[in-house]
Amino acid sequence: MLYYVGADLDSTYKFACFIMKQVKFNDLVKNIKVQINASNIVSFSSKRLVSFA
């Protein structure tokens, strides 16, 4: 079957959930997601600090 990942976050999230269920890598994907979120927050904070310096 052909699956289309839409530009909107909702369909992309649903597609990601489908993949996670199929591949059974739920814990691995969650760990990667948390690491990505943490690094995004850190880089965002760094940019804010630099812009205020």
Swiss-Prot record:
Where found, per UniProt? Plastid, Chloroplast
Q: Name the UniProt key words of this record, in alphabetical order.
A: Chloroplast, Plastid
GO CC entries: chloroplast
Q: What is its main location?
A: plastid
Q: What is this protein called?
A: Uncharacterized 6.1 kDa protein
